[in-house]
């Protein structure tokens, strides 16, 4: 499989995952908060719902942009990469204790940021 086809597949796959995660966080922020942080507070519920809406918008935007070809998709993939990189850094800097939840979030968000950045560079090549 050529790099451009693999980049397109990766971008679409991440967009679909972003829609699923975003929908879950938007519709069930208490559950996602418990899974993510181990607790649920009103502030966490609001933050999770807001981040869920962000991911839902980025994922839907990317999927809709596929109608315009790779050049239309690239900006959405770059925006998603940026959001995931910020999420990874925020969780990395959150607190001094290492937890499995925190480590998993940093790993998943960091990997998504890296793959998205790679795909974005190849989408319009």
Features from the language model and the residues they span:
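Short amphipathic, positively biased membrane-proximal segments
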Residues: 1-125
């Amino acid at each position: 499989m050529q790099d451009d086809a693999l980049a397109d597949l990766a971008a679409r796959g991440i967009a679909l995952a972003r829609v699923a995660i975003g929908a879950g966080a938007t519709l069930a922020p208490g559950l996602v908060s418990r899974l993510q942080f181990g607790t649920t507070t009103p502030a966490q519920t609001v933050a999770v719902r807001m981040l869920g809406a962000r991911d839902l918008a980025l994922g839907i935007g990317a999927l809709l942009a596929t109608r315009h070809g790779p050049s239309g998709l690239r900006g959405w993939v770059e925006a998603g990469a940026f959001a995931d990189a910020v999420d990874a850094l925020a969780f990395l800097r959150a607190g001094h204790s290492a937890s499995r939840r925190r480590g998993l979030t940093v790993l998943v968000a960091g990997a998504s940021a890296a793959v998205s950045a790679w795909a974005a560079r190849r989408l319009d090549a």
